[in-house]
A protein has these predicted regions:
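Histidine-centered beta-alpha loop that forms part of the nucleotide-sugar donor binding/catalytic region
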Residues: 1, 15, 22, 76-77, ...
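PLP-dependent aminotransferase class I/II
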Residues: 21, 32, 36, 44-48, ...
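Active-site phosphate-binding strand-loop segment of PLP-dependent enzymes
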Residues: 25-107, 113-120
Length: 200
């Protein structure tokens, strides 16, 4: 179970996407089916922590290590969620979060966060974020401002969106608790329907 943005991020850069079926109990990637989908062209595994429910990351990381693959966690819906005490998005090589208006924490529209858990990706991510220029070298006086070294775009959040997001991050526990209370209200109200087999 996923959303098109996850696949698009790779397909738009020429990657061939191979989907792996889900576990019906979590709606997340079925870790027992990953190995069968790996080919000699596979570069990465992209677990999607749907609705903040963690994928089976121990198994996924073992498979990635065995086949020398990268793991990019789609934690778009998993801010403040964890797996065995580790925050989601911090386990794989990279972790991606979304602040789209439909998420628990929003920047009043679009926006996101990339966690870089592997130093090999830090410089490339910075260059991509800065329209393909190496700003850290520019600020050290080593290159001019308009020396393009790679492809990129302007992935910098505007000040108003950043301020809006910051205000929510300061109250993230309260926001998450309110949402959990709403979830519990629905769960308690609907569980009798499950008991009487009106829903599964």
């Amino acid at each position: 179970y996923t959303f098109v943005s996850t696949a698009n991020a790779f397909a738009l850069r020429g990657a061939k996407i191979i989907f792996v079926d889900i576990r019906p109990d979590t709606m997340n990637i079925d870790e027992t089916k990953i190995e069968a989908a790996i080919t000699n062209k596979t570069k990465a595994i992209i677990p999607v922590h749907y609705a903040g429910v963690a994928c089976e990351m121990d198994t996924i990381m073992k498979i990635a290590s065995k086949y020398n693959l990268f793991v990019v966690e789609d934690a778009a819906q998993a801010i403040m969620s964890s797996y065995k005490g580790n925050p989601l998005g911090t386990i794989g090589h990279l972790g991606a979060f979304s602040f789209h208006e439909t998420k628990n924490i929003t920047s009043a529209g679009e926006g996101g966060l990339l966690l870089i858990n592997d130093e090999r990706f830090a410089e490339r991510a910075e260059i991509t974020r800065e329209k393909g220029t190496n700003r850290s070298l520019f600020f050290r006086g080593m290159v001019d401002k308009y020396s393009w070294v790679d492809i990129g775009s302007s992935y910098l959040m505007n000040d108003v969106s950043a301020a809006y997001l910051w205000g929510q991050l300061e109250k993230i526990d309260e926001i998450q608790n309110n949402r959990l209370n709403s979830w519990n209200l629905y769960y308690e109200g609907l569980k009798n329907l499950e008991k009487h087999r009106y829903i599964e």
